[in-house]
A protein has these predicted regions:
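N-terminal secretory targeting modules
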Residues: 1-79, 87, 91, 124, ...
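Short, basic/glycine-rich phosphate-binding loops at helix/coil junctions
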Residues: 37-48, 94-100, 132-133, 226-227
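Loop/turn elements at helix/coil->beta-strand transitions in domains of secreted/extracellular proteins
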Residues: 75-77, 98-99, 125-129, 163-169, ...
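Oxyanion-hole/transition-state-stabilizing segment in secreted/luminal serine hydrolases
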Residues: 80-81, 86-105, 110-153, 175-180
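Extracytoplasmic/secreted envelope proteins and their assembly/folding machinery
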Residues: 114, 118, 147, 151-158, ...
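Active-site segments of SGNH/GDSL-like serine hydrolases
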Residues: 132-138, 158-195
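Charged, glycine-enriched surface loops/patches
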Residues: 147-171, 201, 205-211
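Catalytic His-Asp segment of secreted/periplasmic serine-dependent ester chemistry enzymes
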Residues: 174-261
């Protein structure tokens, strides 16, 4: 298995066409596929503009961070740090009354997260940080990344947290599926075998670094090893049912991390 992740438009298009013929995937009309492809390409063009203007997207939480008061005495603040899966998590209903801070940014890779880790995590003085990252690195959102590149970035995030007395919950990357039109476009950029390889490393690294590992992938996978269709319409981002699976697992991992804080 190659460990280099290629973000080539030609490779992506060829993979999409082959998946459309897959017996397990939902059949899509040419018009539907064309619209979905155009939407994805427009999204990617928009991301390029963001990368040129503010690579780490430091401005996203600048005002919110400035308004956030230091933790009160005895407060067990937790920062959730990641990409769209964190960004879209409905904290108000999932974690009511908890001192949890959401610092997810859609589309981000670990390279971008390193840029903003001081501002969006360290400066907020949490007891625990929950890191969920890697799927967009595999997809090549900010350029080709080998698994070793992703692992190095994650290790640096963990080392930075531990150097500042912050306990770490390291999350598995969620599986993906190709059961809908939109999902068929996202699927080729996130090969399941690469997600599995990264998760294997994340679990081992969590153990060796004294972090807590939270496994979302296993309970969210179907018998093919893909994300259960009912947990995400687009094959990637959890819906309410998906977050309902994730929330108690996150809470259990945070509780374990706080025991050692």
């Amino acid at each position: 298995m190659t460990r280099e992740i290629i973000c080539s438009a030609l490779v992506q298009t060829a993979a999409v066409l082959s998946l459309a013929a897959c017996a397990h995937a939902q059949q899509a009309s040419p018009d539907a596929m064309a619209r979905a492809t155009e939407d994805l390409e427009n999204w990617r063009k928009g991301r390029v503009r963001i990368y040129m203007d503010d690579f780490g997207e430091l401005k996203r939480y600048r005002a919110a961070n400035a308004k956030l008061k230091p933790p009160a005495a005895g407060e067990k603040r937790v920062v959730f740090f990641g990409d769209s899966i964190t960004d879209m998590w409905p904290f108000a209903t999932a974690f009511p009354g908890k001192p949890y801070v959401n610092r997810g940014i859609s589309g981000q890779t670990t390279s971008q997260m390193l840029v903003r880790f001081r501002n969006d995590v360290i400066a907020l003085a949490p007891k625990v940080v929950v890191i969920l990252a890697g799927t967009n690195d595999i997809a090549g959102n900010t350029g080709p990344m080998s698994l070793e590149d992703i692992e190095g970035n994650v290790a640096t995030l963990v080392e930075l947290a531990r150097a500042h007395g912050i306990r770490v919950v390291l999350s598995s990357v969620l599986p993906v599926h190709n059961y809908t039109v939109t999902a068929m476009l996202r699927f080729p950029r996130r090969p399941p075998e690469q997600i599995a390889a990264l998760n294997k490393w994340l679990k081992a690294y969590a153990a060796s670094s004294g972090s807590i590992y939270v496994d979302y992938a296993t309970p969210m996978s179907d018998d093919r090893g893909l994300l259960k269709k009912g947990l995400a319409e687009d094959g990637l981002h959890p819906n309410a049912a998906g977050y309902a699976v994730m929330t108690p697992l996150a809470e259990q991992a945070i509780a374990k991390a706080l025991q050692g804080s």
